[in-house]
């Protein structure tokens, strides 16, 4: 409500989402929000609405000072609600809108009885029907990647919310499809860091494909600068089998060094060995 019903919400929060190109329909669909700059605006409103201080602290919406006073964890941040597969909001990601280097760009809800980040995927509630229909799940890194793709008409997309992929998240996807396509921006270090998570997907018996975006682009930016037909065509043209992708990437890095080339062969064989025998 503070996003659309208050001057501060409209001037700061809504302006940010509009600048990102999100329509009112998209903002409503993903229940995007804003937590005001005041230290305790949400805490006060929630306690007045009947929520106990203990509940607000346990769910991570508020933080208790030593004197028992509450302040808002997400103050002065835009909010990305995280839903479970049934659509219930169980946590939040909050993005800061100032360039304060002393504060993290994103703050997430702490783990609680209702929020276990290793068993949650952002966007899965809105994506699951389309994942079943398309028999494929696109996996991206950030909240805005999911939202921009959805707005472009590609709804079978989820995010691990910037955390390393877990076996619990892979099993969630497996409920709906055997096929995962991972979308990477051009950051080689980030791609290599994700290999462990991808090996876990292979081990779970799912088919993994990879799409690499051009340098300087990510799923969010590409979806904004191309229409739905162009985006679909790009994904189809650039989708490649993970094991081939991994072999190409590591081979380029190894160059003509025989020791490094032998290491590449060993690593690829190890990945292939993870594929369950029943496949």
Task: Give residue spans per PLM region.
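Terminal amphipathic helices with adjacent charged low-complexity linkers/tails
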Residues: 27-36, 279
